[in-house]
Amino acid sequence: MTELDQFWPACLARLEAELSSQQFNTWIKPLTAEAGDEGIALFAPNRFIMQFIKDRFLPRIEELAVELVGELPVELRLGAPTARPAAPVAGNSQPKAKEPAKAAASAPAAPSPAKQAAVKAIGGSHESTRLNPSFTFDTLVTGKGNQLARAAAMQIAENPGDQAYNPLFVYGGVGLGKTHLIQAIGNHVFQKNPQAKIRYIHAERYVADIMRAYQHKAFDEFKRYYHSLDLLLIDDIQFFAGKNRTQEEFFYAFNALIEGGKQVIMTCDSYPKQIEGMEERLISRFSWGLTVEIQPPELEMRVAILMKKAEADSIKLEHNVAFFIAQNVRSNVRELEGALKRVVAYARFTSQNITLELVKEALKDILAAGNRQVTVDAIQKTVAEYYKIKLSDMHSKKRSRDIARPRQVAMALAKELTQLSLPNIGDAFGGRDHTTVLHACKTITEMRASDADIAHDYEALLSMLRN
């Protein structure tokens, strides 16, 4: 093995140690390398990843090249190596999958006449995807809250069955666009290959279908169908909790699809290890591929969502009006779009144009609820109870991590949920300087993107304080 051949495995090992598992699996792992006479070529599977690598990681890769083998030109290309693939990344506990099967799988055997009703009960036509055609990547507004999830989704849509992203587990609060995101994958795959066998299904419907299949003695057909899919998208998988028979059947379906190189995508309202009533063997498998979070949209993204929705529905919406709605409806995309629908309906019923005054009247109950501001005292008390520390620790000078981290979380929550300035927030935390508050907010924002536990804690506290 030449020095160039040894470079990429060594570089991968260094990057894996430096980056979070999400960053490494999403951006670095899909790359392949080919050593040439004068340097090394890195191949990205699509333009989106190639551009992201160029902007964020290529300088570090070039630094490692100099450090590991001396002066080494590194070239970034689109596609795949013509010679041999890069060395595999060690440490993946997932069983080796077969090569991703082409989506044009043969159709399952037709049910016997005696079981036609049962087949209909378990999902209707086998050709039906149950995808909403309006849920596409083009109609999905992207912001900091869903940037990583969208990037992973686009990669999967281009290369379904890729072991690094299989399964994809998307989690986050209610109404944040998880369903839109995973259906965008399904629609993209179907557009590329209409022969692909795709099924989108809500977890509750899957449970009901299993029960019907047993009642109608049609379980063989049910099993044959789900085991033969190219792409399975299951929404709100937390509904499997406590349903042992459903979990057992899904376990076998999951294994059959993954081992066949087929893609499985799931959404949930919480991180896999936080799901109560779910078998450990399933929770373990949920983490085989990539787990990504969707966070509540920031202000700029909320404005963009409103403007895009208004444009799609041919509604004249001024930017200042959208900004006002976005400022006052912060929880999730569903409530944001619901507020816009209420404004539009009010304008039509009263035959008025959509103005700031009309919005204030149409949303007066929402605005009244929003005006009941969360206080810093309430934030400190809630965070202290959540992390099981003393309330006085919020004001103390203690700097141990088990005290400092909850205090930083509380500062970040105070910045998001109150109208206080940074100096005022600092005063409420034992007279700290505004730069300390700013540092705390920045730290927590970065950790929410890289640490699943911190992200989960923050969202849980947000929900508790808002409700």
UniProtKB/Swiss-Prot annotation:
Residue ranges, annotated region (Disordered): 84-126
Bilayer-crossing residues are none
Quote any Pfam family the record assigns: Bac_DnaA_C
Region of interest: Domain III, AAA+ region: 130-347
UniProt binding sites for ATP: 175, 177-179
Region: Domain I, interacts with DnaA modulators; residue ranges are 1-79
SUPFAM superfamilies on file: P-loop containing nucleoside triphosphate hydrolases, TrpR-like
Task: Give an example GO molecular function.
Answer: ATP binding
Q: Name one GO cellular component term.
A: plasma membrane
Localization, per the record, is: Cytoplasm
Alphabetical list of Gene3D superfamilies matching this protein: 1.10.1750.10, 1.10.8.60, 3.30.300.180, P-loop containing nucleotide triphosphate hydrolases (3.40.50.300)
What keywords tag this UniProt record?
A: ATP-binding, Cytoplasm, DNA replication, DNA-binding, Lipid-binding, Nucleotide-binding
- Please list where the region (Domain IV, binds dsDNA) is annotated: 348-467
What InterPro entries does the database record attribute to this sequence? AAA+_ATPase, Chromosome_initiator_DnaA, Chromosome_initiator_DnaA-like, Chromosome_initiator_DnaA_CS, DnaA_C, DnaA_dom, DnaA_N_dom, DnaA_N_sf
Q: What segments bear the compositional bias annotation Low complexity?
A: 102-121
- Renumbered to this chain, region (Domain II) spans 79-129
Can you supply a Gene Ontology BP term from the record? Answer: regulation of DNA replication
What UniProt notes about the protein's domains is: Domain I is involved in oligomerization and binding regulators, domain II is flexibile and of varying length in different bacteria, domain III forms the AAA+ region, while domain IV binds dsDNA.
> Which HAMAP family does the protein's record reference?
DnaA_bact
User: How is the quaternary structure described?
Assistant: Oligomerizes as a right-handed, spiral filament on DNA at oriC.
Family per UniProt?
A: Belongs to the DnaA family.
Q: What does this protein do?
A: Plays an essential role in the initiation and regulation of chromosomal replication. ATP-DnaA binds to the origin of replication (oriC) to initiate formation of the DNA replication initiation complex once per cell cycle. Binds the DnaA box (a 9 base pair repeat at the origin) and separates the double-stranded (ds)DNA. Forms a right-handed helical filament on oriC DNA; dsDNA binds to the exterior of the filament while single-stranded (ss)DNA is stabiized in the filament's interior.
Task: Name the chain's protein.
Answer: Chromosomal replication initiator protein DnaA
Q: Which organism is it from?
A: Chromobacterium violaceum (strain ATCC 12472 / DSM 30191 / JCM 1249 / CCUG 213 / NBRC 12614 / NCIMB 9131 / NCTC 9757 / MK)
> In the UniProt record, what gene is named as encoding this protein?
dnaA
